[in-house]
Amino acid sequence: MSTSKATATYLRSIMLPENGPASIPDDITERHILKQETSSYNLEVSESGSGLLVCFPGAPGSRVGAHYRWNLNQTALEFDQWLETSQDLKKAFNYGRLISRKYDIQSSTLPAGLYALNGTLNAATFEGSLSEVESLTYNSLMSLTTNPQDKVNNQLVTKGITVLNLPTGFDKPYVRLEDETPQGPQSMNGARMRCTAAIAPRRYEIDLPSERLPTVAATGTPTTIYEGNADIVNSTAVTGDITFQLEAEPVNETRFDFILQFLGLDNDVPVVTVTSSTLVTADNYRGASAKFTQSIPTEMITKPITRVKLAYQLNQQTAIANAATLGAKGPASVSFSSGNGNVPGVLRPITLVAYEKMTPQSILTVAGVSNYELIPNPDLLKNMVTKYGKYDPEGLNYAKMILSHREELDIRTVWRTEEYKERTRAFKEITDFTSDLPTSKAWGWRDLVRGIRKVAAPVLSTLFPMAAPLIGAADQFIGDLTKTNSAGGRYLSHAAGGRYHDVMDSWASGSEAGSYSKHLKTRLESNNYEEVELPKPTKGVIFPVVHTVESAPGEAFGSLVVVIPEAYPELLDPNQQVLSYFKNDTGCVWGIGEDIPFEGDDMCYTALPLKEIKRNGNIVVEKIFAGPAMGPSSQLALSLLVNDIDEGIPRMVFTGEIADDEETVIPICGVDIKAIAAHEHGLPLIGCQPGVDEMVANTSLASHLIQGGALPVQKAQGACRRIKYLGQLMRTTASGMDAELQGLLQATMARAKEVKDAEVFKLLKLMSWTRKNDLTDHMYEWSKEDPDAIKFGRLVSTPPKHQEKPKGPDQHTAQEAKATRISLDAVKAGADFASPEWIAENNYRGPSPGQFKYYMITGRVPNPGEEYEDYVRKPITRPTDMDKIRRLANSVYGLPHQEPAPDDFYQAVVEVFAENGGRGPDQDQMQDLRDLARQMKRRPRPAETRRQTKTPPRAATSSGSRFTPSGDDGEV
């Protein structure tokens, strides 16, 4: 990433390949050119309207895919053509590697006489090879993957699909493009030689058993010996030797033809056939051999190969009964290789795009763009300017971290074209460090991208600790970029813009490093990561290192390194994963950046950054972003570990340089910085003066206090054998440490009391108050987390005040208000029983689900405090309105002025409501209730009940009417 532009150019080229190529910012710095190649095809749809596109999105060469058509009955595939870049790259370039690639697949051309396009597209990215796909039908394509970012289904052909290549790895090598080599003038016509693509070939080997060959059906008819899957898209070489013998001497000379056929995806017609023939006679029938030796160039691979078949045939009818047995002179086998087959992207992954029900003779357009890093051939190189690749850890690891979150950021390998076009704006924002990410905010990604930027973008020293868990140890970040400008060596990381990033140097030498900087220590130690606690080692030794950075000249700070047996390279940062050897290969050490000039004890050790020593002897180590330790102190510590320490870890830190007599320790520089690092762990520094403990002034009394407990201290076996005074130091320092420090503490306190200084008096009071209230450990941990006392200053800036009287209502009033509020909400929800008094008895809680169901089912008020869990899953069967039931019963039974319905009829209506879950009767139930009412009304009266007789009405006179007055035939 260039410093002149705040843009992640490599990531932009991956996301938006049409914007052009950008150099891969890894540590492969070959001179190369950048080139963009296009691919454009108008594929005609067959009569079946269905077909298949096989895409190789990561292939580093010119072949980017293939097109197949289904036959009219859609029972078999038919190969149509390769899909390639517009220029055959191997004609002008020797090596290359792919940067990015994209395909757009859609249809927009109407055949004559049509006014609308039909058809849909299915697409899926498969992590395996083409031969591993079980079914290639349109509907089964979606079962290739369960990842939603890797498939699209039922997209209209007019809308289109976009296939985007996402890297499957980094630090990929340049691949030979199978260019032809120059040849002499006497070469015969047609003869040529090429450099095969064999950096990482995929090799296949057919091993045949030492058994009888299957019997052939007739002469000239091949009989299959073996068939299986194999993926080949470019040149291959076949070698092999099939040895066999016959049971009896052949009557006539018999020719055995062993045939190796390379088959495609569509049919059983061989793409390439390799045949090896041998003549079996009476002289060699007990040990005949057929040898394969043939090279097949890429031009002969006319379509993708997915299968191979090995068969044999005879030319003599009489030889059919004379059985042949394999393995007469050794194992029978045939092998062949697929050039570049194991390079990521060549054979896997693949993307399959199937189309269906398209109009015959319509055109399916494939438009692709591929970006490459290419190395020209010698002729072209004379007239073309090439440039070195730039190692840009920020740009590379920003791309890695973004792609490692592709699920959260919804970065797909297969897109609906309109969705990809909508997403291009967000991609441009992600690759622009100056953008405030407004579009990403709308998608909900801004916080994630900002977090990645904070880790990846500021400086290299803050990048790798956070990135390591995401991208692993794939990058050997520093590589061979080493400048040895001192005894310790210095590792530098150079960015594309020409500036150096902060990479901590680990000094264990006597060179002048600089003055102690607390600010630098705080800033860089905050990047440490991945702490691991190890059980108490069998033995070990501790030595200090001094760290510096290029961006802060003259500043330094120290840390400790513990060397223990066994190999633990996985506990080291990738920058420190360096293996050094003792003299004459008598042992090795991980984490030391230079070979050891003396012999070891044939053991392997590891130098680990020390975080903490536990009371039980366990050690806590951590990963730090720094180079491996070097210099005299590391050699001194290793000499002690190999020759003088048999068990345990001495509770002290060793520094110095071994003199030529291998006994005296020569003082070295940087002792004050190393002493501070040792005191932070409560350990003394040994070796700054011959035979005398360090005498370094320190302003902090607490830094001299040694933690409780003790690690086992090994007494030197044969004192003064290697280093003078070592045995005396190791015996006396640890044993007299506690008494000496107690005297030092008492003397310091006595001197402090004599000083009439208010500040000292306050400090003493503060120490006493801290110890009295058992706050020492808490304050110490706080000081490590808040070294500048920013948070603590805010916390204690306002002293505590007397408790004020609470404002507002008292507790009883507040609870009553709470009960009233809950009661109102419960009544609104249908719990009429939930009065404020009931809520108070229910511990000021509303009705539980069980209590509410109990009331709805039984109609009774639940007891406060009981949960009625048995009623939670019961259905509500009790009718909620008894007045409604009574009115309905009276209405069905009779008119309002008649007598009310009997209790039996009420019960029948209640049962109907209960059966309906509280709802009224339906039409059939209503008719049943009417029939029941009529039956109840017709019930016979008891026998003792007399039927009341009524007086019959008086009969009217025959001549009277209401229009004539009564009388004896009077006239009107």
From Swiss-Prot:
Q: Which residues bind a divalent metal cation?
A: D26
Organism per entry: Infectious pancreatic necrosis virus (strain Jasper) (IPNV)
Q: Which domain of life is it from?
A: Viruses
Recorded GO molecular functions are:
metal ion binding; serine-type peptidase activity; structural molecule activity
Query: Does the keyword rRNA processing belong to this entry?
Result: no
Task: Please report the stretch or stretches of sequence annotated as the Peptidase S50 domain.
Answer: 509-734
Its GO CC terms are: host cell cytoplasm; T=13 icosahedral viral capsid
Q: What name does the UniProt record give this protein?
A: Structural polyprotein
- What are the positions of the active site? S633 (nucleophile), K674
Instruction: Locate the region Disordered.
Output: 797-817, 917-972
List the residues marked with site Cleavage: A442, W443, S486, A487, A495, A496, A508, S509, A734, S735
The answer to whether UniProt assigns keyword Transport to this entry is no
Protein function: Capsid protein VP2 self assembles to form an icosahedral capsid with a T=13 symmetry, about 70 nm in diameter, and consisting of 260 VP2 trimers. The capsid encapsulates the genomic dsRNA. VP2 is also involved in attachment and entry into the host cell. The precursor of VP2 plays an important role in capsid assembly. First, pre-VP2 and VP2 oligomers assemble to form a procapsid. Then, the pre-VP2 intermediates may be processed into VP2 proteins by proteolytic cleavage mediated by VP4 to obtain the mature virion. The final capsid is composed of pentamers and hexamers but VP2 has a natural tendency to assemble into all-pentameric structures. Therefore pre-VP2 may be required to allow formation of the hexameric structures.
Query: For bias kind Basic and acidic residues, which ranges apply?
Result: 801-817
Cystine crosslinks: none
EC number, as in UniProt: 3.4.21.-
UniProt's post-translational modification comment states: Specific enzymatic cleavages yield mature proteins. Capsid assembly seems to be regulated by polyprotein processing. The protease VP4 cleaves itself off the polyprotein, thus releasing pre-VP2 and VP3 within the infected cell. During capsid assembly, the C-terminus of pre-VP2 is further processed by VP4, giving rise to VP2, the external capsid protein and three small peptides that all stay closely associated with the capsid.
